[in-house]
Swiss-Prot record:
PANTHER family: RIBOSOMAL PROTEIN L25/GLN-TRNA SYNTHETASE, ANTI-CODON-BINDING DOMAIN-CONTAINING PROTEIN, RIBOSOMAL PROTEIN L25_GLN-TRNA SYNTHETASE, ANTI-CODON-BINDING DOMAIN-CONTAINING PROTEIN
Annotated keywords: Ribonucleoprotein, Ribosomal protein, RNA-binding, rRNA-binding
Protein name: Large ribosomal subunit protein bL25
Gene Ontology molecular function: 5S rRNA binding; structural constituent of ribosome
Gene: rplY
Similarity comment text for this entry: Belongs to the bacterial ribosomal protein bL25 family. CTC subfamily.
Species assigned in the record: Helicobacter pylori (strain G27)
Length: 178
């Protein structure tokens, strides 16, 4: 479980001091809970996120434990280092909006015909209760030829999950190389 510290002071000086000590500034919020300003050690946080299997994961702040999902993050445009992360605390049975990653498998036929695989949409916006949240959308790209794509409407439908993106948006496709 990922452990963080609750920030007593939310001043700019305090944030700079925490960043200098190797902390990532974060905010935990959700329906029915009070916002919690906190900080996590940067490297263990990144390592934990890369190794986790599900979108929802537990964090411990002080004596409280929250089930959270990464809602938004900010990176330094020059160094590409994480600066800030917003964590949405989820409650069982309460619908929320999430962004579910798209993963692809297979090698498209179009790559042999001088095509390039283009991932147009890395995340799909959905609305559902946390217990119905899919970990990812898996797309088989093997049958795709040049100038073919998979749209949002072609994705696997999950029960009790409403896709918020327009159904005619391309998710992944093969385009012709110039």
């Amino acid at each position: 479980m990922l452990e963080g510290v609750i920030r007593e002071s939310i001043t700019k000086a305090n944030a700079k001091a925490l960043k200098k000590d190797g902390y990532l500034i974060a905010n935990v919020y959700g329906k029915g809970i009070e916002n919690v300003n906190c900080a996590f050690k940067l490297n263990p946080f990144i390592k934990y996120l890369k190794e986790k299997k599900h979108l929802i994961f537990p964090v411990k702040l002080g004596d409280k434990t929250f089930e959270v999902v990464v809602q938004e993050y900010q990176k330094n445009p020059v160094t590409n280092e994480l600066i800030h992360v917003d964590l949405l605390a989820v409650t069982k049975g309460v619908k929320s909006k999430f962004k579910v990653p798209v993963k692809h498998q297979g090698t498209p036929v179009g790559l042999k015909n001088k095509g390039i695989l283009m991932l147009s949409k890395k995340r799909i916006s959905v609305e559902c209760a946390p217990e119905h949240l899919p970990d990812h959308y898996l797309v088989d790209v093997a049958p795709l030829d040049v100038n073919e794509s998979i749209l949002v409407r072609d994705l696997e439908k999950h029960e009790n999950v409403k896709i918020l993106d327009h159904d005619s948006i391309a998710v992944i496709g093969v385009i012709k190389a110039k």
